[in-house]
Amino acid sequence: MAEHFYSPEARLDLMGIWEFIAQADLNAADRVEQEIRLAVEWLVRNPHLGHSRSDLTSQPVRFWAVHSYLIIYDPNARPLEVVRILSGYRDVAAMLK
């Protein structure tokens, strides 16, 4: 398994995403969670694949989309840090302040 860790906020984000989707469909919630976790594994091996978004934050993070969710991570941290996992429909800039 590639080295990475989820910040406390990212862990809560992932739990909230699962709970939200599970209200309608448990299997879909499991699938989305698994797809997010697989994307994080991919990003550990290819940390600069994501996009910088200076319009959203001055933090040295990158963004990678999985469905309507944004994995926000520090590509330079070792191990790679998943900072947040947020819905693209939310005010991401405000949530990263």
Please name every model-derived segment.
Residues 66-69, 74-97:
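Enriched for short, Lys/Arg-rich terminal
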